Amino acid sequence: MRCPKCGGNKSSVVDSRQAEDGNTIRRRRECEECQHRFTTYERVEERTLVVVKKDGTREQFSRDKIFNGIIRSAQKRPVSSDEIEEIVNRIEQKVRSQSDNEINSEYIGSLVMDELAELDEITYVRFASVYRSFKDVGELESLLKQITKGSKKKKDK
């Protein structure tokens, strides 16, 4: 492993442990030439996933795109970035567990909406308003009625 400080090619592993996500190994290394310590991460190489969008175009799966979409929807809401990261991890795990290398964007969107419905209703509505591209206020109103019914059922339990 090349040292980021001096560019030396020889380093030794000082410490090695499993990272928090359980899918990555974190290694502390020390350069044998300049004694600089640095961290590397090792993970299984994932298969490339392709997202098929509504218009038929294809693009590589991006967990950052999901994360950023949720962040925008959760702006000024009591939702932490750790909670969002956990949601994105669960969604990515579900998507990668599919046998197909191509995933419809609608499937990913529905996974996000399912997660947000459990997390925060306002964040859910904000995301849904963009994801579903409501044609008029009536469509949004029917979504709000569904959420209100769901909230009442949760409170009654």
Swiss-Prot record:
| Highest taxon of source | Bacteria
Query: What's a GO biological-process term for it?
Result: negative regulation of DNA-templated transcription
Q: Where is this region: Disordered?
A: 1-24
> Any keyword Magnesium?
no
MF GO annotations: ATP binding; DNA binding; zinc ion binding
**Cofactor binding note from Swiss-Prot or TrEMBL:** Binds 1 zinc ion.
UniProt keyword Metal-binding, yes or no: yes
Which PROSITE patterns does its entry note?
A: ATP_CONE (PS51161)
Q: Which family, according to the similarity comment? A: Belongs to the NrdR family.
What's this protein's name? Transcriptional repressor NrdR
| High-level lineage | Bacteria, Bacillati, Bacillota, Bacilli, Lactobacillales
